[in-house]
Amino acid sequence: MNPEQSPLGKATVYAAQYDASLLFPIPRAGAREQLGITSALPFFGTDIWNAYELSWLNARGKPQVAIATFYVPAESPNIVESKSFKLYLGSFAQSKFDSVDAVRDVLKRDVSAACGASVSVQLVSAHDFRKLEMDELDGLSLDRLDLDADVYEPDPSLLSAADGEDEAPVEETLVSDLLRSNCPVTGQPDWGSVQIHYVGPQIDHAGLLRYIISFRNHTGFHEQCVERIFLDIMRACKPVKLAVYARYTRRGGLDINPFRTNYNQPMPDNARTARQ
């Protein structure tokens, strides 16, 4: 299936009852081939989806609400198109389930089937909402730099790193809130924050910020943009270790937060940023 066949940008009919067939998978392979990935993945990681508009009926017909988090492995063959995900979650609203566990089991089964890999699902019920945290991405802000920018399509030539053999490798965590890309189907802007942690030659901060800004007119799904950022930094700056984590603002009750790395480390924190 390709994005043009998805529900994006089309008139919407909301399902009256639970319907797993609403999920619309999109293969990752096409976008990855455009990035030069044709065999083994040069990274691993997770796409963290948070769903804020999930509701269903209990066995007695009383509405229940929860926030759902889905952990989709980067090696899954498919992603789920976001509007189809919204419509699928909306189909729970007038359907009865015996328990929260029953809802979680159905979500895990259906989304795993659509993605082609095992997806972890967590549900936070209303009485636990106050436990949810909000925080900003840790790291040195690139946005502090006062600079000119005039490139608004991804340009890896903006990236550079120290090349002296005598230069000791550095370890840095850098962040920016200036990431913007655009939906490849509707053209709607997607706003995000990005965190880049690396070990290796010192990356030029001004060039990295200009590179992040260069996504401003780019069309691509969230996951594809993060993978492109990861690969461009690896190729241009040659770090020994690299991790890229983006948190995008929500649309349609969903936010998507892709994480890619080439070394083992804990799962990134799923705390919402202020803009989410």
Swiss-Prot record:
Catalytic activity field: 7-aminomethyl-7-carbaguanine + 2 NADP(+) = 7-cyano-7-deazaguanine + 2 NADPH + 3 H(+)
- Lineage: superkingdom: Bacteria
Which SUPFAM superfamilies did the record assign? Answer: Tetrahydrobiopterin biosynthesis enzymes-like (SSF55620)
GO terms for cellular component: cytoplasm
Q: Which Pfam families match?
A: QueF, QueF_N
Task: Give me the residues that bind substrate, please.
Answer: V80, E81, S82, H222, E223
The record's subcellular locations are: Cytoplasm
| Enzyme class, spelled out | oxidoreductase
One BP annotation, GO: tRNA modification
EC number(s) stated in the UniProt entry for this protein: 1.7.1.13
Pathway listed for it is:
tRNA modification; tRNA-queuosine biosynthesis
Please provide the record's keywords in A-Z order: Cytoplasm, NADP, Oxidoreductase, Queuosine biosynthesis
Positions with a binding annotation for NADPH = S82, K83, R251, G252
Q: What GO annotations for molecular function exist for this entry?
A: preQ1 synthase activity
Mainly localized where? cytoplasm
Subunit structure of this entry? Homodimer.
Q: Which family does it belong to?
A: Belongs to the GTP cyclohydrolase I family. QueF type 2 subfamily.
Give the function comment from the record. Catalyzes the NADPH-dependent reduction of 7-cyano-7-deazaguanine (preQ0) to 7-aminomethyl-7-deazaguanine (preQ1).
Q: Give the protein name, as stated in the record.
A: NADPH-dependent 7-cyano-7-deazaguanine reductase
